[in-house]
């Protein structure tokens, strides 16, 4: 049972557009994360133009919800020159924090968005306390850890970093087969750059083996006649393990899914909100909320790397869609 005196972490929900932002806010998010039309890792999420961003911040703040804006691509020289103006717009709109991965973007954020906290993206692959402390010394107020860490590794980071440094981790949603999204497959195979939010997800393709001297003959790795899903990942779901997440001292629990539906934003945010509130009150988790996250479109659930190295899911990459919104 969770100590009801324990400080609850922030519940951070995705907001791909205004409709999804409203769902996340109304269903209990403490904060939302979104992107402008540039510099975000979800190019097809909808995102917010400058006027929409102002309206989004105003709506969230009216409900006492914080807004974090992603600038977590790795900008090239022709892109970085546009970043100061973008940062100034975020600062003027009242965005609470910017999420960055590139050191240059981090530096510019300190200059052009002084009212915004600087959070270090999972794209930076922070996996140890030395790296976390280095970012803190540079002025970061939060680090978003690599998804590949176990609970014990997170505990070690928390025990060896200043209490003022907030630590955020993903607890629900899609996972990348590459190390915290650092994947070149999409760029190589389709020309769509994953580091600029345009990943084509070739890890979800149907693969088979072909022997060099037998072109055209394909050998399934598993029994699936379409080939094996050798790079495929399950989706993360930690709703049954909130006690363990709270024990390691996380400051923020993050839900993946800016490209997902408004229904997803509502159901998943609401389920985690109720479970966290139950934890705060010392109540056992009601299994109805675990059932709720089964109602959204998802791949088979797993706990990621939190309890060690996960097994591979070879069967297929299809979403489970057993429920419809009416």
Q: What do the PLM-derived regions correspond to, one by one?
A:
Residues 1-26, 31-34, 38, 63-73, ...:
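Surface-exposed amphipathic alpha-helical tracts and adjacent flexible/coil segments at the periphery
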Residues 81, 116-129:
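Gly/Gly-Pro- and Ser/Thr-rich, intrinsically disordered tail segments characteristic of DNA damage-repair
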Residues 113:
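Conserved phosphotransfer cores of two-component systems
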Residues 39-41, 58-60:
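Long C-terminal interaction/binding lobes of large macromolecular proteins
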Residues 45-54:
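Aromatic- and glycine-enriched glycan-recognition loops and surfaces
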Residues 69-70, 100, 120-122:
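Short beta-strand elements of ligand-binding domains
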Residues 104-105:
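Alpha-helix capping/helix-boundary segments
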